[in-house]
Amino acid sequence: MTTVCRENLAPVSGHESVDIRQAIAKRLQLCHGSGMHFHRSLPLLGCVLFAATPGLSLAEDFSFDALCAKARKMAAAPYAAPKLELADFWKNLTYDQHRDIRFQMDSGLWAKEKGPFSIDFFHPGWTAKKMVLLHEVKGGKSTALKFDQGLFNYGKQKIPAGTPSPQGYAGWRARTHLNTADYMDEFLVFMGASYFRAIPKDAPYGLSARGLSINSGLPGVGEEFPDFSEFYLEKPGKDADVLRVSALLTGESVAGAYQFTITPGPETVVDVVAEITLRRPVRQLGLAPFSSMFWFGESTHPKPYDFRPEVHDSDGLLMELGSGNLHYRPLETTKGQFRHCVFTMEKPRSWSLLQRDRSFLSYQDPEALYHNRPSVRVEPVEGFDLGKLHLIEMPTRDETDDNVILLWEPQPALEVGKTARFHYRLRWMRDPVPSGLFTVRATRSGTPVQLPDQVLMTIDFAKPLEAELKVGDPKWDDISKLKPVVTINQQSVELIHVGLTDISMPNVDALPAGLGRGDKLHMPQVLRAFFVCKPPADLTNMDLTCELQDETGKVVSERWVYLWNKTQ
């Protein structure tokens, strides 16, 4: 794997990345603001609505292959934006007015049948001005689900006489018995452009996925946001544990067809098959893209004036190379700086955007529950032989902006007019599968006392618990045989000292036990690797790595990969 990182040291206020960040935040407001906090039950209030009587929808043959053919045909023609009209009244709704429109959960698709899944619909308005077409698929036949105002409680809204009904829904979410047998919890949301989010059991929503990204994080290049414009919801069987959905992707530069096979549970798995055709060249095509938030963590300098020690949806990128080696890159944001790291990889086994710190004490936020935010693992299946994994970190003013982008750019680039097929799996989970290695748990930086020209880095490695070890894995009871190995890519940097200490021993400050869901009464043994280096005064950044090795030189930990900059 090769790595290239670049930074823009100019203030963000004058940089193109501001537009990118605001665009992402605007799209994600659709999910944060409209879809995630509906009440479980609401009284039905009477209101007078004026809408055209929906006509009967005729069933049509449907298959994913036919949808792929439709997408290819669309890609061969000039882009035509969907012509779904939304009246000004709905467009001009305020946040509170739009939030007051509630979907009646007992009227959801399949809800009255008491089956394994039901579907809620989102009402367009406020920032959710784009609409999508929904179809139900039964027995290979699809039927359009026309907009129905009777499915919503409009609260105190006074809808002007003659206001046309919307011609589509803003999005949808799926429910199942995820946490308890007596309530249908939401576990999946599609809303806004090609954004979607999922959660495993006992977790709140966190980072967002997308179907596709175009030109994300490229300075001076406008980002394009293709839309899932049509969805085909396949009716599940009575005892089904899987929900299957197909979607049509449309955009100025691309058309495509997606099939999602979703299995909710302690680990919610979203299997994705996509056929994509470019209608014109793009600078960067992003597969399996994610948007997340990292405001500040234990290594952030200076920290915002906030009562919480850390605020983030994700705190690290874990990359499993084709060789099986694991590299861990902590997330970080620096005031006024834009960071873009590119990892060139061949046949990667997986990569994950993790929320690894599970201690409530690290966040102190009983409402946002950052210690319980889900992690996501991407497992390539087809079409990921060679490419670049892009990690883009942008400054943010607060926790409402998603400022972290992760995407896979396939190599070679897709050719215009040629259809490419990709298959990958997303695992939305609480904790990653144990590797049997020491794992990076925390990164901190500073300067030694009275030595401001030097840099002190500490990396905490957690020993795998015995229950996590496979047959034949070493238990590492004697840590004296381990040593940290540090590399610095700049030859001008002087490495002064390297050390390793056990900070879980009684005679040193132990890490506190976590207070989050699922935390045990004990912590794994934690070793703290540390090193001091002296960069030249004019050096603005350093690429650093650290890993633990045994006496034979065998690597026994993840490799910590870090980009240090002078403002830290």
Q: What are these language model-derived features?
A:
Residues 52-54:
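N-terminal signal peptide c-region/cleavage motif recognized by signal peptidases
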Residues 96, 189, 283, 287-419, ...:
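A contiguous, surface-exposed recognition patch within enzymatic or periplasmic domains that forms
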Residues 60-95, 99-104, 122, 362-568:
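Terminal accessory/anchoring regions of large secretory-pathway or extracellular enzymes
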Residues 209-264, 385-397, 401-402:
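Extended, loop-rich substrate-binding clefts of extracytoplasmic carbohydrate-active enzymes
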Residues 247-293:
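Acidic, contiguous internal or C-terminal segments within carbohydrate-active enzymes
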Residues 75-219:
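Solvent-exposed N-terminal domain segments of exported/luminal and surface proteins
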